[in-house]
Design a protein with these regions (language model features):
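Class I S-adenosyl-L-methionine-dependent methyltransferase catalytic core
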Residues: 1-183
Length: 183
């Protein structure tokens, strides 16, 4: 696992083997960020990373110039690893919270340019993520929600669904806040 772009490009991440995670593969992450390069400007954006695990995605956004990256995971071991890694590489824009993601979303009052969610594949509440994010008005106008999930799972029922990209057994489903971007 490595950072593929930005100021920390090439940095190898070596999380402890006992973390309860399934990190996004380098191949899938590189494909995701290539898609995003054509859609958003990373410099200065505000990102919410749900089920952040090792922080692989959070650190990638921070490396590429995100102004603020909020990472949420319920594992104290993942939270501690990401806090330590962020501190070690002076990524002050990464803020890490130990919390159940669904509880966090119910309390969240901020809005983001991008929300990324990589829940455990066996989580039966994955289809609820877009519903909650949009009900809570967590995305800025024009902003994206990206949910990583098993390719065999379909979560395209939400009206804000834009597209799904498959990478082997993993897929990214994209949702866009279609609210007036001029507001």
């Amino acid at each position: 696992m490595r950072i593929i772009g930005g100021t920390l490009r090439g940095l190898r991440l070596n999380p402890p083997k006992n973390l309860p995670v399934r990190p996004t593969t380098d191949l899938a992450k590189e494909a995701l960020f290539n898609i995003l390069l054509n859609q958003i400007e990373f410099e200065g954006i505000k990102v919410l990373d749900l089920f952040s695990g090792t922080g692989n995605i959070s650190l990638e956004f921070a490396s590429r110039g995100a102004a603020e990256v909020i990472s949420v995971d319920r594992s104290i071991h993942c939270v501690n690893y990401l806090k330590d890694t962020s501190r070690q590489h002076k990524l002050d824009q990464v803020k890490v919270y130990k919390e159940d993601v669904f509880k966090y979303l119910q309390m969240e009052t901020e809005q983001y340019d991008l929300v990324f969610a990589d829940p455990p594949y066996d989580l039966n509440k994955i289809p609820e993520i877009p519903k909650i994010v949009f009900e809570r008005n967590i995305l800025l106008p024009g902003a994206l929600l990206i949910v990583e999930h098993q390719s065999m799972q379909n979560i395209s029922q939400h009206p804000a669904f834009v597209e799904q990209r498959k990478y082997g057994h993993s897929s990214f489903s994209f949702f866009r806040n279609q609210a007036d971007e001029q507001a």
